[in-house]
Amino acid sequence: MVRPKTEEEIALMRENGILVSRTLAEVGKIVAPGVTTLELNRVAETFIRDNGAIPSFLGYDGFPAALCISVNDVVVHGFPSDYVLQEGDIVSVDCGTLYKGYNGDSAYTFPVGEVDAETRKLLDVTKESLYRGIAAAVAGNRTGDIGHAVQTYAESFGFSVVRELEGHGIGKKMHESPGVPNYGRRGQGARLTDGMTICIEPMINAGLKNVYLAKDGWAVRTSDHRKSAHFELTVVVRKGQAELLSTFDFIEDNVKF
């Protein structure tokens, strides 16, 4: 059984959520054509450490960077590299922080310069599907209610939901129970209780739902090489309405798209 967090633990995780949200905003400020993904990683790691925290992803199961940076058809877990961002790309930036013994986790997919109408729709729908999932993250519901909300919204626009990857519980460990799929049926899955802390993270493909693992053993790519978007927030399950621990406000108030 999943142990709900105490209010003291949630307060520490709230600090983490703000830090990871601010980190993504710092990264977003420099996303532009001509910038390498290594530079995005450098900015994030410096900001995290300057604020007294540790990048959670660095060294996690051998992962070599502070950020997962996934461009275009890379769904998640891409490595920062000397790849130069191009006009029309999209770049998913997934950030984790360890602060005062607890983890924070959030992801945002940024457009690089001007993107085409289908790509813009993919970004908008994926982000809204996240909010639909969050609306279902209330005490008494089940993880299937979250997945159903994400899936039905995304698929209504002709997009597809990745099945092999899912959200997760979070706390002292980056990945805790329960798993939080982005598809499912109402009333199925783990029961949500007040005080549970979970990450909801839709990964939505423009084309087919199928994905494959790249040769580096980390990056997950779409099978048809069409674009994929990824948005993630950490929430506390509450009675009536989930509480956000991370937020996109710092990004959307400070970054021009």
For each of these PLM feature ranges, what is it?
Residues 1-257:
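Active-site neighborhoods and metal-handling regions in enzymes and metal-associated proteins
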